[in-house]
Amino acid sequence: MEQKPSKVECGSDPEENSARSPDGKRKRKNGQCPLKSSMSGYIPSYLDKDEQCVVCGDKATGYHYRCITCEGCKGFFRRTIQKNLHPTYSCKYDSCCVIDKITRNQCQLCRFKKCIAVGMAMDLVLDDSKRVAKRKLIEQNRERRRKEEMIRSLQQRPEPTPEEWDLIHVATEAHRSTNAQGSHWKQRRKFLPDDIGQSPIVSMPDGDKVDLEAFSEFTKIITPAITRVVDFAKKLPMFSELPCEDQIILLKGCCMEIMSLRAAVRYDPESDTLTLSGEMAVKREQLKNGGLGVVSDAIFELGKSLSAFNLDDTEVALLQAVLLMSTDRSGLLCVDKIEKSQEAYLLAFEHYVNHRKHNIPHFWPKLLMKEREVQSSILYKGAAAEGRPGGSLGVHPEGQQLLGMHVVQGPQVRQLEQQLGEAGSLRGPVLQHQSPKSPQQRLLELLHRSGILHSRAVCGEDDSSEASSLSSSSDTEDTEVCEDQAGKAASP
């Protein structure tokens, strides 16, 4: 006898009735329906609070396959289509069953027919591959909306006011007029020969070693580099309005930071070099052995990280202004005025960043962190070596002075100034093993000759003849003023 294909009888859905008791009633694990535990309290915003399933009348949970249904009818319809079960469904009562939330599991055929009758769409049920593709599309749409929202938020951020634009233009012009070689530095730079500064060869009195040839090259550019920082500051009205004493303290504190920033933004990843003063391209070891020690690592790392920001001249200029107007310097008189000036530059800086609309997420806070890195990495790197003669950075004393960390500040410089006569000439014999002159003595003489050590030079009151003459009494008085300010700045 030919056996008829088995049919699924009414109420025998294997997925919905797998946990039935002998009396035909559905068991509930742990006394609670899993569906209700997972969906409890969830109502989509487009549904009314007590909206019912159009198939069985149970509480609806959403819009499924073009109809508002409960989770049970949604799952039943999906399984039926995915597994192609509807040809096997049958009804004992001539397809006349009433489907509600109590009887819905007793006749699969009538339940399926009602799903079709109320408008549930079979073509919206996806197989596994289509479902994966749909989820991918959903994720893409979410990402697109996220980007659109970010663009809208950027467009809504405030841009510079007319007053801030004036501040920005002045700072930008001050930077461009004092930035050696400008945007043409790559074409005009000269690489320091590889045989210079590759190995520390001369022992200094403090036990460190330095390549004097590299040091000699650096001393040729240090005076104009410091002078350009001073000129930049003097072109800012907010700085020029400060007392002369505060101007000197601010310049002493920021000189190394600004010169390091100017070198860092001229980092070239192809040659792995920094271009100092817009003209001399040096490698890490050359900078380190030429007198800068471990700080060279901090400047190179800063250059690498800043290269991703693609800063323009205005952003570099405003960053320098923020570094200049720092109230962290000891001995300041007009702290409130300086703090307000820094806040004005910070606000203009933030609004200008909004104006440029960088593609880097969270560009502004990241850039602020870099500003703090300029200070912390340069000023406090190697703090464990604070007791050494080279100061808190673990750098040779001549290296610290070479790039303006102290300018006229700290016991190293004061000790050297005691070796200078009133006319600026060196006292005492020059040791033969220290080259014709000690690097410290050479640098100090350079700073005296350039007028960097004189308060009148900083405040714009110097006479050209007085600035060039170290033998005049006025220069000696100015030097004493700077020494006094340096002592205040160095003391806590």
UniProtKB/Swiss-Prot annotation:
PROSITE patterns for the chain: NR_LBD, NUCLEAR_REC_DBD_1, NUCLEAR_REC_DBD_2
Region annotation Disordered: where it falls in the sequence: 1-33, 457-492
Residue positions binding 3,3',5-triiodo-L-thyronine: 228, 277
Domain NR LBD: 163-407
Location of region: Modulating: 1-52
Subcellular location per the Swiss-Prot or TrEMBL entry: Nucleus
Positions of NR C4-type zinc fingers: 53-73, 91-115
Residues at which Zn(2+) 1 binds: 53, 56, 70, 73
UniProt feature coiled coil, ranges: none
Pfam families recorded: Hormone_recep, zf-C4
Complex formation: Binds DNA as a dimer; homodimer and heterodimer with RXRB. Interacts with NCOA3 and NCOA6 coactivators, leading to a strong increase of transcription of target genes. Probably interacts with SFPQ. Interacts with AKAP13. Interacts with C1D. Interacts with TP53INP2. Interacts with PER2. Isoform alpha-2 and isoform alpha-1 interact with TACC1, but the interaction with alpha-1 is much weaker. The interaction with isoform alpha-1, but not alpha-2, is decreased in the presence of thyroid hormone T3.
Protein name: Thyroid hormone receptor alpha
